[in-house]
């Protein structure tokens, strides 16, 4: 299985990484990026990870997986994990996870 990032998820990651570098420094950026990348690889290896949570109330088929202070919002298709958003834990998921977040180019 493989994964794809939506344009919104890609923008989320850029924002997270820029904030981390500015606020916490390059060393923390490298650590956090590795944690997020490891989480994505774990999701790809087992999309129904016990630590993931089904959130059909947000959008049918959506799961959330927590990484430190962020949640990866994704859904599983036949041969691909679609990552729609990477959201800060304090965000209002109901307004951030929508069909628009899962548009892939």
Report the location of each language-model feature.
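Residue-identity detector for threonine
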Residues: 20-23, 60, 78, 95
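Basic/aromatic recognition patch in beta-strand/loop cores that engages polyanionic ligands
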Residues: 50-81
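Enriched for short, Lys/Arg-rich terminal
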Residues: 70-71, 75-105
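Basic, Lys/Arg-enriched alpha-helical interface segments
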Residues: 2-58, 103-104
């Amino acid at each position: 299985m493989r994964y794809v990032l939506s344009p919104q998820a890609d923008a989320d990651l850029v924002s997270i990484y820029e904030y981390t570098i500015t606020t916490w420094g390059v060393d923390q950026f490298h650590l956090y990026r590795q944690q997020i990348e490891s989480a994505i690889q774990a999701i790809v290896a087992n999309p129904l990870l016990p630590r993931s949570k089904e959130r059909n109330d947000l959008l049918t088929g959506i799961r959330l997986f927590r990484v430190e202070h962020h949640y990866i919002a994704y859904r599983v298709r036949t041969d691909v994990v679609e990552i729609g958003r990477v959201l800060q834990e304090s965000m209002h998921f109901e307004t951030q996870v929508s069909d628009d977040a899962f548009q892939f180019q």
